[in-house]
Amino acid sequence: KDVKMRTFITQDNERDDLVAHVYDITYGTIRAGVDNLVIIDDSIVRGTTLRQSIIRILDRLKPKKIVVCSSAPQIRYPDCYGIDMSRLSDFVAFRAVIELLRERGMEHVIEDVYRKAVAELQKGDRSETVNCVTEIYDRFTDEEISAKIAEIVTAPEIQARVEVIYQ
């Protein structure tokens, strides 16, 4: 794809407009309310393109269910597969575990992990640094996180049930 059409590498202020105009579908390819629609995504990082464009477009076909299969595992941390983003909150997997923690009354875990991460940064020897954020993910199964990601990438007006499956 031309770099101007790559929604992932587009600047933040231009991404929302671009994702609404890059993709389209072939109508009449499935039986409305009967067929499930399976798509493959190379990776789900922010979830923006899925939520604001792809799932909306696919929902126009009125499938019974949309299954999004990611050929990559859940992208949970910066600098994974060359993805270098500075804010954990940009990652849909991170937003999913934060929502799960809040839903289950476990907000204290967020503060505990934050304190541990700050303490790690203050250590003199960075060669022994521990990624404390893993503790946030460890409280949930991959399936629980994937189910929450499916909720996040599904806009309220979507009629089809959406499921997200990772490699």
Regions found by a protein language model. Give the residues of each.
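PRPP-associated nucleotide enzymes
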Residues: 1-167
